[in-house]
Amino acid sequence: MIHFTKMHGLGNDFMVVDGVTQNVFFSPEQIKRLADRNFGIGFDQLLLVEPPYDPDLDFHYRIFNADGGEVEQCGNGARCFARFVRNKGLTNKQKIRVSTSNGKITLRLERDGNVTVNMGIPVLEPGRIPFNAKKMEKTYLLQATNPDSTMQTFLFGAVSMGNPHCVLDVEDIEAADVEGIGALLTRHERFPKGVNVGFMQIINSGHIKLRVYERGAAETLACGTGACAAAVVGQLQGKLDNCVRVDLPGGTLTINWEGEGKPLWMTGPAEHVYDGQIQQ
């Protein structure tokens, strides 16, 4: 039997598995079955806690989307990861350092129950996002072919928070065609590894509303790295302050970023739902 915990960060839900004290392996097919909300456990991502590869770190953090594919980063998942390893007694530290497939992040458990994540320095160079562009811009232009073969032009900012994001400004977040445009852009050829697509409505310089179409998972109730990406793009374009409240369908995150070349900090909740076990 494999023990797991169901958790969520603002409704972005996860199956979290301890791979430190348990010997576990999940194939992409198994993850797809487990992620199914009718016939499985149901989740946006599976989070796997592994022993560290570096003696200076506490854990290794792996993330798998509902389609079975492994991805580089998940901000909401990182907060749940921190809460999980403390709740399960895998560490007694307030500050936890973990590696991912794309780098290292620091997690800090706050006294109010929230978790703050040092998401690292946002990557803006197109080739490292990765996004095919001749040079770095604050705003990019892209053309995409609609299902009816008509062409549509999009203006957006692009950034990697350990995973690729593009962020579009919208006037009305409720009216935004998140599913249609998200599906059109997420696998566009100019994003070699696909992209998460954010739709940002600016309320004022310290407050935005956001919906995100996640690569491999469609629209979710919240996307932590998407909130980070939106704050970065808005600040680079001169529209947002250093500290931004981000309202997502599942709740609110606070993003702090002092500007280009500086690390970004994300603060928000991480909730335990239930513990369970499955046969493997």
Swiss-Prot record:
Cellular compartments annotated: Cytoplasm
Binding residues annotated for substrate, in chain numbering: N12, Q45, N65, G75, N76, N163, N196, E214, R215, G224, T225
SUPFAM superfamilies given in the database record: Diaminopimelate epimerase-like (SSF54506)
Enzymatic reactions: (2S,6S)-2,6-diaminopimelate = meso-2,6-diaminopimelate
GO cellular component, one term: cytosol
Pfam family, one: DAP_epimerase
PANTHER family: DIAMINOPIMELATE EPIMERASE, DIAMINOPIMELATE EPIMERASE, CHLOROPLASTIC
GO MF, one annotated term: diaminopimelate epimerase activity
Protein name as it appears in the record: Diaminopimelate epimerase
Description of how the protein assembles with itself and partners: Homodimer.
Family designation: Belongs to the diaminopimelate epimerase family.
Gene Ontology biological-process annotations: lysine biosynthetic process via diaminopimelate
Membrane-traversing stretches: none
Important for dimerization, annotated site positions: Y274
InterPro entries: DAP_epimerase_AS, DAP_epimerase_DapF
Site (Could be important to modulate the pK values of the two catalytic cysteine residues): H165, E214
Function of the protein: Catalyzes the stereoinversion of LL-2,6-diaminopimelate (L,L-DAP) to meso-diaminopimelate (meso-DAP), a precursor of L-lysine and an essential component of the bacterial peptidoglycan.
Enzyme class: isomerase
Organism of this sequence: Shewanella sediminis (strain HAW-EB3)
EC number: 5.1.1.7
Highest taxon, organism lineage: Bacteria
